[in-house]
Amino acid sequence: FKDPRVRLAFSFQSKYLGMSPFRCPSLFTILSFLEYEHGVFHPRGGCGAVSQAMARATEKLGARIHLNEPVEEILFEGRKAVGVRSKSGIRPCDALVVNADFAHAMSHLVPNPLRKRWTDEKLEKKKFSCSTFMMYLGLEGRMDDLAHHTIYLADDYRRNLRDIEDDHVLTAQPSFYVQNPTVTDPGMAPEGMSSLYVLVPVTHQHDNVDWARETKAFRKVVVEQLEKVGIDDLDQRIRYEKILTPALWESEQSIYKGATFNLAHTWGQMLSRRPHNRFEDLESVYLVGGGTHPGSGLPVIFESAKITSQLIEEDARKVKKTTFLPSRSGDAGEVDRAWGSAATMQSSTLGKPASGSLSKTA
């Protein structure tokens, strides 16, 4: 392709990984093929409906899900995880699955001396993705002329990306993505209303940007950008608004540096060079999420969960072949020794139930 606009149309998908299309490994050009060849699907009830469907399926299989119970500490015997401590007490485990943000979980829940490859010092030197400035809006009136997905790229897209990834400053003309799900799924808002999801790529947490001071002004810039795609009188129509900045991603959602796409997908941090699903620094600890293999993005994260569950099953079969289980001591002395228990770190809250059907979107 010679036209730069067409080139961007077939490469901007790298932002799904939080990366610049001018630097992203060419492996990820497959994303544009998948999108244009097979289309994009919307789960009725939103992406949260997928999590809810999974929750119902696991509960039918006997799992118990504990929400609003943050894990305060992972308990170890040597390098082996034997349980977690939460506000309600200690929960023992034979296998621990960490689906919290990887770097945050390591730096807050795992003692630094227990880690070899992923120490605090090494994490600080890793390259992390950009962050996002988010606006979740409930609007008066329908917006049937606005497509389900709208992507606006800044006129000077290279400059926009340089501001984000190199200079770590706020750009005067940001790119953005808007989702208007009610045109496909009317149940995503009350009758006669619309819900909008606005995502603006920005730098991850950096000393150059003080979000306590900049949020109001940057919101104004974003609203002005939204007017360019025909969203007029926005402030007058807003009935609900929630904003998330990189600072809030870090403080409220426990995302390391507010880097919403986790470790950057550079050649040095891809595939086997990411933290392994069977975590290499600890025993009986498994990872899922954007920080492990294969990488970030919801479909890919689901694949990481599939990989991890298969590894747990393989390891459990090996354990069943043994005839002797050693006694536990230290922190493990507080842990109930009942065999077969499991602990899962829950990093998200499930919303109200919704159907799990899919609709193809434009």
Show where each model-derived region lies.
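Beta-rich nucleic-acid/ligand-interaction surfaces
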Residues: R64-I65, E69-S86, Y240-I255, S327-G330
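Mid-domain catalytic core of redox enzymes
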Residues: E72-P190, P326-G330, T344, G351
